[in-house]
Amino acid sequence: MVHLTAEEKAAITSLWGKMNVEEAGGEALGRLLVVYPWTQRFFDNFGNLSSPSAILGNPKVKAHGKKVLTSFGDAIKNMDNLKTTFAKLSELHCDKLHVDPENFRLLGNVMVIILATHFGKEFTPEVQAAWQKLVSAVAIALGHKYH
Protein backbone atom coordinates (compact mmCIF):
# COMPACT_ATOMS: atom_id res chain seq x y z
CA MET A 1 0.00 0.00 0.00
CA VAL A 2 1.12 3.54 -0.65
CA HIS A 3 2.38 5.62 2.27
CA LEU A 4 1.38 9.28 2.33
CA THR A 5 3.24 11.68 4.58
CA ALA A 6 1.40 14.16 6.79
CA GLU A 7 2.42 16.93 4.35
CA GLU A 8 1.06 14.98 1.37
CA LYS A 9 -2.21 14.29 3.17
CA ALA A 10 -2.52 17.98 4.04
CA ALA A 11 -1.89 19.01 0.42
CA ILE A 12 -4.52 16.55 -0.83
CA THR A 13 -7.10 17.57 1.76
CA SER A 14 -6.53 21.27 1.15
CA LEU A 15 -7.08 21.01 -2.59
CA TRP A 16 -10.02 18.63 -2.23
CA GLY A 17 -11.76 21.16 0.03
CA LYS A 18 -11.78 23.62 -2.89
CA MET A 19 -13.02 21.07 -5.44
CA ASN A 20 -16.40 21.43 -7.12
CA VAL A 21 -17.24 17.72 -7.14
CA GLU A 22 -20.22 18.04 -9.48
CA GLU A 23 -18.34 20.03 -12.13
CA ALA A 24 -15.05 18.14 -11.87
CA GLY A 25 -16.74 14.74 -11.71
CA GLY A 26 -18.59 15.21 -14.97
CA GLU A 27 -15.48 16.62 -16.57
CA ALA A 28 -13.31 13.72 -15.37
CA LEU A 29 -15.66 10.96 -16.50
CA GLY A 30 -16.39 12.80 -19.74
CA ARG A 31 -12.70 13.16 -20.48
CA LEU A 32 -12.13 9.47 -19.72
CA LEU A 33 -14.84 8.50 -22.22
CA VAL A 34 -13.46 10.83 -24.90
CA VAL A 35 -9.75 10.08 -24.49
CA TYR A 36 -10.22 6.33 -23.94
CA PRO A 37 -13.29 5.55 -26.10
CA TRP A 38 -13.21 1.82 -25.33
CA THR A 39 -14.37 2.70 -21.79
CA GLN A 40 -17.72 3.76 -23.26
CA ARG A 41 -18.82 0.12 -23.42
CA PHE A 42 -19.42 0.20 -19.67
CA PHE A 43 -21.90 3.05 -20.11
CA ASP A 44 -24.10 1.81 -22.96
CA ASN A 45 -27.23 2.86 -21.05
CA PHE A 46 -26.08 6.51 -20.96
CA GLY A 47 -27.55 7.39 -24.34
CA ASN A 48 -25.68 9.52 -26.86
CA LEU A 49 -21.90 9.12 -26.56
CA SER A 50 -21.27 9.65 -30.27
CA SER A 51 -18.96 12.68 -30.04
CA PRO A 52 -16.91 14.62 -27.50
CA SER A 53 -19.58 17.33 -27.28
CA ALA A 54 -22.33 14.71 -26.82
CA ILE A 55 -20.33 13.01 -24.07
CA LEU A 56 -19.38 16.20 -22.23
CA GLY A 57 -22.96 17.48 -22.42
CA ASN A 58 -24.58 14.19 -21.43
CA PRO A 59 -26.47 14.57 -18.11
CA LYS A 60 -25.94 10.89 -17.23
CA VAL A 61 -22.17 11.29 -17.67
CA LYS A 62 -22.24 14.36 -15.43
CA ALA A 63 -24.37 12.64 -12.78
CA HIS A 64 -22.24 9.51 -12.70
CA GLY A 65 -19.06 11.60 -12.68
CA LYS A 66 -20.35 13.39 -9.59
CA LYS A 67 -21.06 10.00 -8.01
CA VAL A 68 -17.53 8.81 -8.83
CA LEU A 69 -15.91 11.89 -7.34
CA THR A 70 -18.17 11.74 -4.29
CA SER A 71 -16.89 8.19 -3.74
CA PHE A 72 -13.37 9.47 -4.25
CA GLY A 73 -14.08 11.83 -1.36
CA ASP A 74 -14.28 8.70 0.80
CA ALA A 75 -10.65 8.06 -0.13
CA ILE A 76 -9.74 11.51 1.15
CA LYS A 77 -11.44 10.74 4.47
CA ASN A 78 -9.89 7.26 4.72
CA MET A 79 -6.43 7.59 3.17
CA ASP A 80 -4.99 5.01 5.57
CA ASN A 81 -7.68 2.40 4.91
CA LEU A 82 -8.41 2.43 1.18
CA LYS A 83 -8.72 -1.33 0.73
CA THR A 84 -11.61 -1.54 3.22
CA THR A 85 -13.12 1.75 2.01
CA PHE A 86 -13.41 0.48 -1.56
CA ALA A 87 -14.05 -3.23 -0.87
CA LYS A 88 -17.71 -3.14 -1.94
CA LEU A 89 -17.01 -0.99 -5.01
CA SER A 90 -14.18 -3.33 -5.99
CA GLU A 91 -16.51 -6.30 -5.72
CA LEU A 92 -19.24 -4.54 -7.75
CA HIS A 93 -16.87 -3.51 -10.53
CA CYS A 94 -15.23 -6.95 -10.65
CA ASP A 95 -18.12 -9.38 -10.22
CA LYS A 96 -21.10 -7.54 -11.66
CA LEU A 97 -19.78 -4.87 -14.04
CA HIS A 98 -16.61 -6.69 -15.20
CA VAL A 99 -14.66 -3.45 -15.52
CA ASP A 100 -11.02 -3.84 -16.52
CA PRO A 101 -9.06 -2.62 -13.46
CA GLU A 102 -6.71 -0.71 -15.77
CA ASN A 103 -9.58 1.75 -16.22
CA PHE A 104 -9.25 2.80 -12.57
CA ARG A 105 -5.66 3.86 -13.25
CA LEU A 106 -6.74 5.75 -16.36
CA LEU A 107 -9.47 7.58 -14.44
CA GLY A 108 -6.97 8.48 -11.71
CA ASN A 109 -4.64 9.99 -14.28
CA VAL A 110 -7.54 11.93 -15.80
CA MET A 111 -8.38 13.24 -12.33
CA VAL A 112 -4.83 14.55 -11.96
CA ILE A 113 -5.21 16.39 -15.28
CA ILE A 114 -8.52 17.88 -14.11
CA LEU A 115 -6.89 19.04 -10.87
CA ALA A 116 -4.04 20.63 -12.81
CA THR A 117 -6.42 22.50 -15.11
CA HIS A 118 -8.62 23.68 -12.24
CA PHE A 119 -5.88 24.73 -9.82
CA GLY A 120 -3.05 25.89 -12.10
CA LYS A 121 -0.04 27.20 -10.18
CA GLU A 122 -1.48 25.89 -6.93
CA PHE A 123 -1.04 22.38 -8.36
CA THR A 124 2.72 22.29 -7.80
CA PRO A 125 4.90 19.28 -8.64
CA GLU A 126 4.84 18.34 -4.94
CA VAL A 127 1.04 18.46 -4.85
CA GLN A 128 0.89 16.45 -8.06
CA ALA A 129 3.20 13.82 -6.58
CA ALA A 130 0.89 13.46 -3.57
CA TRP A 131 -2.19 13.15 -5.78
CA GLN A 132 -0.46 10.63 -8.07
CA LYS A 133 0.27 8.48 -5.03
CA LEU A 134 -3.34 8.72 -3.88
CA VAL A 135 -4.98 7.96 -7.23
CA SER A 136 -2.59 5.02 -7.66
CA ALA A 137 -3.52 3.69 -4.23
CA VAL A 138 -7.24 4.10 -4.99
CA ALA A 139 -6.81 2.23 -8.29
CA ILE A 140 -5.06 -0.60 -6.45
CA ALA A 141 -7.83 -0.70 -3.82
CA LEU A 142 -10.55 -0.75 -6.49
CA GLY A 143 -8.73 -3.53 -8.31
CA HIS A 144 -8.18 -5.58 -5.15
CA LYS A 145 -11.09 -7.97 -5.76
CA TYR A 146 -9.58 -8.95 -9.11
CA HIS A 147 -6.61 -10.64 -7.44
From Swiss-Prot:
Post-translational modification Phosphoserine, affected residues: S14, S51
Keyword Metal-binding: yes or no? Answer: yes
State any GO CC term. hemoglobin complex
As annotated in Swiss-Prot or TrEMBL, what is the tissue specificity of this protein? Red blood cells.
Please give the biological process terms from Gene Ontology that the record holds.
hydrogen peroxide catabolic process
Judging by the UniProt lineage, the source's domain of life is Eukaryota
Where does the sequence pass through the membrane?
none
One Gene Ontology MF term: peroxidase activity
Q: What are the binding positions for heme b in this chain?
A: H64, H93
Task: Indicate the quaternary assembly.
Answer: Heterotetramer of two alpha chains and two epsilon chains in early embryonic hemoglobin Gower-2; two zeta chains and two epsilon chains in early embryonic hemoglobin Gower-1.
- Stated role: The epsilon chain is a beta-type chain of early mammalian embryonic hemoglobin.
Protein name (Swiss-Prot/TrEMBL): Hemoglobin subunit epsilon
Originating gene: HBE1
